[in-house]
């Protein structure tokens, strides 16, 4: 199975979600001077920021990661985390990345996710990679 790539801020909400998911994953560093390079297809898991506005919804570290042409070419889907308090901007980073990278928006969850989110994403990611492999 291919990997997940994720970003998590100092709050560690997304990191805790990824740990609970128990799938292979690589983390985009908090320190923007450190670069993550991927060499295989991945699904991006990204939190949404900006407090309910479009500006700043995608973390700067994720933008920097996707601005690397190799990293951008290997993205196959996106999953977003967010806060329902942001209203229409809930998980907006996922919408933006899916549109700009022309990949499917696979799932969205709130904060650290629920047990149902974990089960749904685990099943969905596993099936997604099986379909990708079958079409290769």
Curated annotation (Swiss-Prot):
GO terms for biological process: protein modification process. Gene3D superfamilies: 3.40.50.360. SUPFAM superfamilies: Flavoproteins (SSF52218). It holds the Pfam family Flavodoxin_NdrI. GO terms for molecular function: FMN binding. InterPro entries: Flavoprotein-like_sf (IPR029039), RNR_Ib_NrdI_bac (IPR020852), RNR_NrdI (IPR004465). Belongs to the NrdI family. Probably involved in ribonucleotide reductase function. This is Protein NrdI. It comes from Erwinia tasmaniensis (strain DSM 17950 / CFBP 7177 / CIP 109463 / NCPPB 4357 / Et1/99). The lineage of its organism: Bacteria, Pseudomonadati, Pseudomonadota, Gammaproteobacteria, Enterobacterales.
């Amino acid at each position: 199975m291919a990997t997940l790539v994720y970003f998590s801020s100092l709050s560690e909400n997304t990191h805790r979600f990824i740990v609970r998911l128990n799938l292979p994953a690589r983390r985009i560093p908090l320190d923007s001077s450190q670069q993550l390079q991927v060499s295989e297809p991945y699904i991006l898991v990204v939190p949404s920021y900006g407090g309910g506005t479009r500006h700043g919804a995608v973390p700067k570290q994720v933008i920097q990661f996707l601005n690397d042409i190799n990293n951008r070419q290997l993205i196959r889907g996106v999953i977003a985390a967010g806060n329902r308090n942001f209203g229409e901007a809930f998980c907006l980073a996922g919408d933006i990345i899916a549109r700009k990278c022309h990949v499917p928006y696979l799932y969205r969850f709130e904060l650290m996710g629920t047990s149902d989110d974990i089960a749904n994403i685990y099943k969905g990611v596993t099936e997604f990679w099986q379909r990708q492999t079958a079409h290769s």
